[in-house]
Amino acid sequence: MTQKKNILFRVSGGRAFNKELGLGHVYRAINLALELKPTNIFFLVEDYGNVKSLLLNWGFKNIFLLKGGIKISSDITETTKLLYKKKIDILIVDKYDYNTKKYVKRMHKIVKTVVVPDLEKIDYDADLVVNGFIGFDNTILTNRYGAKCLLGPKYQILNKKYQNRKFTNQKKYTILATFGGFDEHNIVPVFCKQLTKYLDRITAKIILGPATKKSKELKNLEEKFRGKIKIISATKNMKKEIS
């Protein structure tokens, strides 16, 4: 009987101000982890708030936490301990800061390492780089360190629900507004204030994001315009919301 692989995701995310972080890295890791089952999945998370609860909600239980803003030396130490303790076969890194390249280089000496970066970043000393940045042509190449790179929208990591291209065409709301994982700049109240001017003609659904709290102001607004505006914290099926 073939033994299951042990895969560790190192991600960062949550309610982090002035870091442009949110939950994008976490959701991408979740989408990939769901496709990698029935392997043994572990998460090592630099949690700025709400990440652990989100992972638990998706059914993941092997979650280990790091403090937000952890120093690179401590990050490497804690990751290394976990690699050996859980006998990790593959490390998948989906985080971005100025220390990520140094972190990946160190980890690559210990374990097979995959990096999932953003924008035009590809030069990591790893085994595999997966970058679905829309600005890349779909291609496979080797970077300066000899790592295989899967580039372009073809390799974007999305929830498998998007593989079904059928749409329901049953629109309940005129407008659907989503603010990612975390509304760092508090745009939702401003948006809602303007939206109320047009609720005699439209209906709207707003998805705050798992790391954004539903304030008393928003609850009152939803109650005042019941049937015209619906505000939820999150969804597990964004395709269903937009189709």
Task: Annotate each language-model stretch with its function.
Residues 3-8:
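Extreme N-terminal starter segment of soluble prokaryotic enzymes
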Residues 9-20, 28-35, 46-60, 64-145, ...:
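Active-site and donor-binding regions of nucleotide-sugar-utilizing enzymes
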Residues 23-37, 189-195:
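Histidine-anchored nucleotide/phosphate-binding helix
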Residues 40, 61-64, 112, 203, ...:
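Conserved beta-strand segments of alpha/beta enzyme cores
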Residues 40-48, 204-210:
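Short internal beta-strands
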Residues 111-117, 157-163, 230-234:
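Short gly/ser/thr-rich secondary-structure transition/capping motifs
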Residues 125-186, 214-216:
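A nucleotide-sugar donor-handling region in carbohydrate enzymes
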Residues 170-243:
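Donor-nucleotide binding loops and adjacent catalytic segments primarily
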